[in-house]
């Protein structure tokens, strides 16, 4: 349902917002009919065959579907150039108080509207590319894990990759990248490890915001909204990064057998529309975990690490204030 990207729709009704149309003097007649993400929209001819156009979704909504996150509390994170985390909230449109977006998830024709909380991290795998292309610390992206494993930790070094500001949940366009905690003993391996840690730290900030939003709805009671994080995307192949994520977020991280969850979601949506797949239960049987990562870090160490990260982010933002 790409209609939401126009900002002219009412996500609660699934219809165009008549008040906004009137305010902006947009005739309702020029807008297309709103359709679900999984139904037959039309046919076209290709090499003499009639083919159906039967599925459409935004890339992250498609990845959520491809990971078969169909129930409230199920979440996925795509580790690409940036990181994009969506947590399903069922038929409840949660209005975030912690810097997240409320989005409509992809679904089939005839189903009730379902929602998710969404948080975007601007620099995910891009920080590894920066290590490779600009600092020349590694020759290939996969080298980052090799060198990061040569040290037990980052030795107090924090890298905040705010190359183009900070995304969710901070949303600070003025922030700029920083490396803090350097000593005479800091080596390239510490910096590489700190770069990988920054991806996991930023993702944990989004997870914490999601948990806080759900806790607020429940009157501050109940367990965290996210206890399992399904992951995909190129950087999800990095075992060390996935273990860091599990440790920093204190949750199980489950790597998909198919790293291309967005493509899988598109195929699932189209397949359901034309009857190639019977239902969502069949889709669940087609997906699975390649590997799971469980938390190994103590809660005390986790709090110390996250505290250092949040101080580094604060210092990064404070430094940038002088440029505003």
Where are these regions (language model features)?
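Glycine/Thr-rich phosphate-binding loops that ligate phosphate moieties of nucleotide
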Residues: 1, 6, 35, 89-324
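Short beta-strand scaffold segments in enzyme catalytic cores
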Residues: 6-7, 62-65, 83-87, 159
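Short beta-strand to alpha-helix junction loop
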Residues: 10-12
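Short, structured coil segments at secondary-structure junctions
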Residues: 24-27, 49, 248-251
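A short acidic Gly-Thr/Ser loop motif
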Residues: 39, 56-60, 78-82, 227-229, ...
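Conserved phosphate-binding catalytic cores of ATP/NTP-utilizing and phosphoryl-transfer enzymes
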Residues: 40-51, 55-74, 87-91
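Gly/Thr-rich phosphate-binding beta-strand-loop-beta motif of the actin/hexokinase/Hsp70
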Residues: 75-78, 82-89, 266
